[in-house]
Amino acid sequence: MIQNLPLAICCSTLIGMACPSLLAQAEQTLPREFFVSPTGSDANPGTRSSPFQTLEKARDSVRAAIPSAQGDIMVTIRGGIYPVRKTIVFNHQDSAPGKQRITYRAAAGEKPLFTGGVPVTDWKPYKDGIWKAPLDRSEKLRSLYVDESRAVMANSGKKIRAQGGWGTYTVTAGQAPWAWQSGQTADGIQYNVSDLPKITHNISDVEIENQTTWNKNFVGIREIATEGDKYIFKLQQPYGAIAQQIGWDAGLTLKSEQIIHNALELLDQPGEFYFDRDEKTVYYIPRAGQNMQTAKVVAPVTQTLLQLEGKPIKNRLRNLTFEGLSFAYTDYNLMEIDGSHGTATLQTACINTAFANPNWHYDVYRSYDVLPAAIIANAVEGVELKRNTIAHTGCQGIVMSNDIHDVRIIGNFIRDTGGSAITLGHPQHVYENDTPDLKHPEGAGIEHEKFPAGTESIPHRVLISNNFLPDNSALFNGHTIITVFFSKHVKIEHNWIENAPYTAIHLGWGWCDFDGYEGTNHPQWGKAPRPSVFPGKPTSVAGNNRVGANRIERSMTILDDGGGIYTLGRQPGTLIDRNYIRSTTFGVYNDEGSTGIVNRANIVQGPYQRVHTTGDHGRKHDIDIEGYYVTDDVWFVSSPNTRVTNNTICPNAVWPPQAQAIIHESGLEPEYRNIVPADWQPYNFDLEGVDPEWATGAVDFAVPGTPSESSRLVSQKGSQTGPANGRIFRQGDELCYRMKFPVGKKSQLVATYWGEEGNKRRFRIYINDQLLATQELYQAHPGKFFDQAYPIPPAMLPAGTHGETTYAVIRFTVEPDGGTVGGLFGLKVLPLPQ
């Protein structure tokens, strides 16, 4: 090799002399890289050793470099904090040309944070366990974060029953841009004086929260008066009227149970805060374990951190990637209309913006819009959001509404958003580029369309995949975690959604109101209370979507009339398959107008009310439901031309291999499982209804009447269950449990019994059909529960292992004349000292 070195140098020199243009061309095609660091300066050249300080400077430098760039451009962003006081905007001038790509990425192993918040420091004790700190801010504060935990606006705690409306507010059509119709609503709401303390300070910051079956609405107050034994909360107008002008009893109502927010007089619980705008002071009651002298406290100030905004159709923002970045602490102070504030909707992640027809279908949803988000995009193509973190938002996480093409939202960790984690599309996309004839006699015309003709396009070919989405919609509980309106060729795959207050995944829009049918009850499509808004003009924009291999655990934790996966409207060619849904109301819910959808090989594990819901109302039709694996045989399926075939009931979640494979493949794929924080504690279903102290240290346990038993009780004969002595028992002729035991270690089975059974009971206990013990119950421990331990001989356990544990079947069998097995109040496996 040493002898050949001069020849190599010579050849290299000759090539360089002969082909200088080739070397220059090769040099130009290498990716060009800029660097950003919190300790840099925007006066620097943006190199590794002299980085920029802001993303805006890097964007501008990239924009200048684009015309001469022959290859991809990289912007590497060092770890640290980047305060965002004004939204960072990328437009069509920031596109990568042709097949090139511009990537804004975190430096390897580092975590750059773009924050819309400011620190709140100098906390001092106030009184009654309340602390206070200065905050220079002119607007009210709806969110505060203490040691990464969301604090709660001071509130009434319990729901207060409204006592009816007060006064009259009159709207005349055309009096303002928001006044589309004439009408009258209440000008205020009455409450019993006995239900609330007297609120005297910063009245305009007080809010009413109104919960309906499937959503929540918020409206501001302008004045509080007292009349006899009633408080009169006078609404901020016109939004108070707009919130009442919502159909289907989904808006602000006058006699429902409500919660009052944001008054110092209501500050009385740990985790609550109140911001006094006049005094510019934040008040907070610490939660257990919080030290306000060392706590990290953040108040949000910026509503949107990143905006990607091309020119619709003609000049989209193209070929950008944002990777490994963190976005957090965004603000949202409700929608402002003519000085009034509120956020109200009929359903899911959109907002009513005008006093219009309560039947929003007649307006073609023109009075509704999407909401703000930490990241907003419009008119983009080939954009990728990958492995980013979004947290602690005042409203939504990501909103991409109009003209979204070939976008990938993959591998992101989005948590603790105020509203939806991801919203795609827009409710007004019923038709693209509406023509003047698309006007109902009682509705708004195209002059109220958000998207002028020639600028409107529904999302096409969008991938939402491998995102970890826990604990979202924290403020606006009616927002679905992933919300997709009208879309085509959209894939929602391998996402893990945990703890959704309403529906986890919402796909589609329009109900049956735009299917083109001129009547109500169609002979093949089924019933509906109303004809299509535009007979003979069906919407045809949506279809060929897929919702597959998602893991959805604990949806519908607060609201009702939704499910793990929920669909609306016509979307032929759409497939919902291989999803694992656990603990919800309805597993899959094909609601009004759902048409041309195949639901296949989904797993629905209890508790739930129904596996699948698709009734015969709302002209939903031509639906397939096939190959499901479920724990309880409870369905509501009566829509026309709907086929239910080859479904398997698996009581107690004893899954066959095919179902186990679906569960294993659902949620995050192996490449993306590292986006879950190492300290993340997934929800433990088994602990529901179980005394944590009793279960401490157990390798496995089963308690009657709880999820821990439902997944372990594999068979039973003559079984009975019910309450006794403050707990739930199970007894019967035979009970079989499949339990987990440690491998190669001593262990014992422990059963909890009542020590004062009225009749003598005698039964045998087997482990894998080998006799373990004989138990007799009578009155050995009067008036109390007791635990009986049964040491497990190692030879009784199977040789096959599952990691560090193995499974065995515990069978309780009553002896002749033994009465019954049990009552059994709990069963657990405990390790023994080795």
Where are these regions (language model features)?
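Short glycine/acidic-rich loop motifs that flank beta-strands on beta-rich extracellular proteins
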Residues: 86-87, 331-337, 372, 394-400, ...
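Right-handed parallel beta-helix
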Residues: 318-329, 361, 381-392, 404-419, ...
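Extracellular polysaccharide-degrading/modifying enzymes targeting complex plant/algal/animal polysaccharides
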Residues: 30-379, 384-389, 430-453, 677-682
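Short, surface-exposed beta-strand/strand-loop-strand elements in extracellular ectodomains
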Residues: 759-771
